[in-house]
């Protein structure tokens, strides 16, 4: 059972690393508000390591790692991470360029079937900057689809042998045995020089939706912003704590308690 977020619990956890989702966790109503962006800077200036973990595309992640106060970004649901090594941007992918090209060709078949069989669905507007997956929009730029339509989209991916995960705005699908948590493990071992099982003792994860459940499972300390509440009954693994506020305001609430 998730608990209300409390600064005393966070203090005892001795947190140094913040892994956070972006959409509806850092953002509010599709925008990164000033208070949440300031909270990122407050964490950075206090010495925390910040790693966004998102389903957003490679093109967005390039900008995020260059312009936000973060140490790395894990994108497209674990397909890669970007970080700086010194002054040079480093990109780590789970597969080769040839494999990515072949997978995109297979995903185009899924795209055609989804658009034909699920009226009202659309390819996500950020698809043109994606390298690993296919994102189907069910509420970002289209009228919100119902749960049955979302489940139908997932089943089409799975019928084609692809992995499918539901975020707060998209159904993301891809080919390959990877996830957000698998790339978090790779990042910890490669860039931090320690296994995730050691890093997680001083780390927390922040999220808002069912595709964050593996991270809720594997992190010792996890936080759900309050909009996670509508999904809780469907989650086997729930966040340790829940904020009072939604989205970016919930993230700010968390940061204020961390820095108290």
Q: Where are the predicted features?
A:
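Short, structured coil segments at secondary-structure junctions
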Residues: 68-69, 77, 160, 218-219, ...
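Conserved acidic, metal-coordinating active-site core of Asp-based
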Residues: 113-218
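Non-catalytic pre-domain segments flanking phosphatase-related domains
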Residues: 1-20
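Mg2+-dependent phosphoryl-transfer enzymes with acidic/Ser/Thr/Gly-rich catalytic loops
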Residues: 8, 13, 33, 181-260
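Residue-level marker for buried hydrophobic side chains located in beta-strands
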Residues: 18-20, 73-74, 205
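Active-site phosphate-binding/coordination module
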Residues: 29-126
């Amino acid at each position: 059972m998730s608990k209300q977020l409390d600064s005393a619990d966070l203090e005892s956890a001795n947190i140094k690393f913040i892994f956070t989702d972006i959409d509806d966790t850092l953002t509010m109503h599709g925008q990164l508000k000033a208070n949440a962006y300031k909270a990122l800077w407050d964490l950075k200036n206090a010495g925390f390591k910040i790693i966004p973990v998102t389903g957003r595309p490679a093109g967005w992640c390039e900008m995020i790692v260059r312009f936000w106060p973060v140490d790395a970004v894990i994108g497209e649901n674990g397909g890669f991470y970007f970080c700086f090594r010194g002054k040079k941007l480093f990109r780590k992918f789970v597969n080769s360029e040839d494999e990515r090209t072949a997978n995109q060709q297979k995903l185009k078949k899924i795209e055609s079937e989804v658009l034909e069989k699920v009226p009202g669905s659309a390819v996500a507007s950020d698809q043109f900057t994606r390298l690993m997956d296919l994102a189907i929009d069910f509420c970002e730029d289209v009228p919100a689809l119902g749960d049955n339509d979302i489940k139908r989209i997932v089943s089409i991916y799975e019928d084609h042998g692809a992995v499918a995960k539901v975020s707060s705005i998209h159904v993301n699908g891809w080919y390959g045995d990877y996830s957000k948590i698998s790339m978090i493990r790779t990042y910890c071992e490669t860039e931090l020089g320690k296994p995730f099982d050691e890093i997680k003792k001083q780390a927390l994860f922040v999220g808002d939706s069912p595709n964050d459940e593996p991270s809720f499972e594997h992190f010792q300390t996890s936080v759900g912003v309050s909009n996670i509440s509508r999904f809780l009954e469907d989650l086997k693994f729930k966040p340790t704590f829940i904020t009072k506020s939604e989205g970016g305001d919930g993230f700010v609430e968390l940061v204020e308690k961390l820095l108290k």
